[in-house]
Amino acid sequence: MDFEIENESEIPQLVDVEEVNTQPHSETLSVPTVSSNNDIDSFEQQSDFLLVDHDSTLDPVPVTILTGFLGAGKTSLLRSILENRNGKRVAVLMNEVGDSGDLERSLMEDVGGEELYEEWVALSNGCMCCTVKDNGIKALEKIMRQKGRFDNIVIETTGIANPGPLAQTFWLDDALKSDVKLDGIVTVIDCKNIDNILKDESDIGFIQISHADCLILNKTDLISSEALSVVRQTILKINCLAKIIETTYGRLDDISEILDLDAYGNENTSNLEWSIQRSNDSNINCSTCLDVDCQHLHSLDTHSLDISTHTFKLPPLMSKEVFQQFLQWVRHTLWSCLEEGEDEEFMIYRSKGIFNKDDGSWYIFQGVREVFEIMPLSEKPRAFLEKDIHPEIILIGRNLHRISPFVVGNQ
């Protein structure tokens, strides 16, 4: 559900259901976040409110955003998805700069000339992930008019696109969210040329990697096993949250590895639990280390990365008061870069976390840039049962070393 925010520093207020249904959609930044003026009990009520499904006879169709730098192999991966969909009805939305649509569409035909996709909506000028969202939303609405035909929607973005604004669209547009849900962002990486990609002045390679829920390391056949290890180390320093899959020629036999990730829900937390466990067990913040003689792999100059992963430990068994302090820290951290006149000291692209409160209940934190949600979990995550793992929030972004950690009593 959307909350209209005029001042980013203000706490979002609950909106009456009837009021939401009758008011026209506003272009004002809407931040769906759980918050409370009083205590954590109000937060629980609001969480339930946020999780109420819209009146629909059909479940939301999962949308996969497929991104990656130019030439990484997105089209090859898309063809692999369509060839191995095992009866799944997949709608495809292309979003490439230039007039390559007919060419790429022809690549989606099997040897008999039969089209491998259910629906094709082409957008010109790479508008989907750039500054204009309207055309992309209209294209999705066109697909959703035939919603019953599809099991999945795949959006292939332009190679120079930032997937962040598109991902936010599924949270910001309430009417759209009732028909589709963001399932995951899949970024394809050209392992052979990743060094040049990360040196690009636009930083788009970093940004695409940082937003990913699943990273496809493509063209692994063109590099040595040692070089592949360097690539994996570099990727983990930028984004420790994403699932990593290695491919050649974009071939993927089991498409369930990248479709139906449920990366933004509260039902499947296994990958986040694994990420938190990995961050507890390994040095994922190596991009900030200063020891030039350290034993980590640095062939891709990871010491100079200003986009990286950083973890912040959270106190276990949060009380009502501590939870309110945590919310205040989250708002300040995620929203401070929105304030006019402020220098961009840091930028957060993706955030995830798991924490608990003192009554034994557990929660998952999800965020893309300044938009975040907190949702209750039905049970204690398995990883926390099997090991002594500390609750934490993981941030992916730029210059994260400038962020003050959450300290109880300092908010």
Swiss-Prot record:
Identification of the protein by name:
Zinc-regulated GTPase metalloprotein activator 1
> Which SMART domains does its entry note?
CobW_C
Write down the chemical reaction(s) this protein catalyses: GTP + H2O = GDP + phosphate + H(+)
Entry annotated with the keyword Nucleotide-binding:
yes
Top-level lineage group: Eukaryota
This entry's Enzyme Commission designation comes to 3.6.5.-
Short motif (psi-PxLVp motif): ranges: 9-16
Domain (CobW C-terminal) spans: 307-411
What is stated as this protein's family in its record? Belongs to the SIMIBI class G3E GTPase family. ZNG1 subfamily.
Claim: Transcription is one of the keywords in the record: no
Q: Name one GO biological process term.
A: intracellular zinc ion homeostasis
Q: Give the organism, scientific name.
A: Schizosaccharomyces pombe (strain 972 / ATCC 24843) (Fission yeast)
The enzyme's main class, written as a single word, is: hydrolase
Q: Where does Zn(2+) bind?
A: 127, 129-130
Q: Motif range for CXCC motif?
A: 127-130
According to its UniProt entry, what is the function of this protein?
Zinc chaperone that directly transfers zinc cofactor to target metalloproteins, thereby activating them. Catalyzes zinc insertion into the active site of methionine aminopeptidase map1, which function to cleave the initiator methionine from polypeptides during or after protein translation. Mechanistically, the N-terminal psi-PxLVp motif binds to the C6H2-type zinc finger of inactive form of map1.
Going by the UniProt record, its keywords in alphabetical order are: Chaperone, GTP-binding, Hydrolase, Metal-binding, Nucleotide-binding, Zinc
Which is an annotated GO molecular function term of this record? zinc ion binding
Cellular component, GO annotation: cytoplasm
Amino-acid positions noted as binding GTP in the UniProt annotation, renumbered to this chain: 68-75, 130-134, 218-221
